[in-house]
Amino acid sequence: MKQDDSQIIDYLIRGNEQSNLNKPLSYSYIANPDQTIRWIYPSKLKTPTFLNFYNSSSLRAKIFTVTIKILFALKLSNLIKSNKVYLPIHEGSLLQRILDKYPDYNHSIFTGTVGKNRKIIVELNNGYKSLVFAKVAISNTSKDLIQNEFHVLSKLKHENLTSIYVPEVLAYNEKDLLEISNIKPKRCKQPSKLIDVQIVALTQINSINHKYVQWKDMQAKFEIESLIENLKVKV
């Protein structure tokens, strides 16, 4: 396990010096080509809900996704090229607080893309379907991104949007954590290119901050008319 990954995991599972240690739990993880951790999940996980983090729009990604699902369905997940690690989760640690809030849920973890925007996402599921995503900031930049996401979702919640489903904000603190609901249907397809419904959704979002005014009321009316007249003269 690389040092960056160890630091990320420690950030999740470490408590203070006085906190008690739980019995180490067995986790499996799937690595990227550079051997950094991509997903980490309890070894007893029965459904590969961590695939909700994965963009499966390309043919190669679709094949990978289907293969993983088949192996889990046949209880052959041990054939997946993964590694195991035992993690002692501290009482009071960030991960333990999240799990305590959803005691009946299973979970998996996406460790984020390396860089200043990196954040951790803890996925919580009922054994079959992802229900909650807890986003954890690990830098000032990712903290700002999570804060911005909270404000955007809060604003969209009060808009009359007919083509968009907006995740519900379940919890938020300004320090490092945003919890949102999963709105992705159990059965859905990810298109490889922009489609009509996405264009309509983007148009609705774009219209939120637009304000329509009559031409006669525009402050720049006379400046624009003057520029047009100058163009006519030059022509």
PLM features per residue range, with description:
Residues 112-114:
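Protein kinase glycine-rich loop
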Residues 175-186:
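Conserved short submotifs of the Hanks-type protein kinase catalytic core
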Residues 149-166, 184-227:
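Conserved kinase catalytic-core helix
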Residues 118-148:
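ATP-binding glycine-rich loop module of kinase domains
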Residues 2-110:
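Juxta-kinase regulatory segment immediately upstream of eukaryotic protein kinase catalytic domains
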Residues 167-176:
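Short beta-strand micro-motifs within the conserved protein kinase catalytic domain, predominantly
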Residues 93-105, 210-235:
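An alpha-helical support segment within catalytic cores of ATP-dependent transferases
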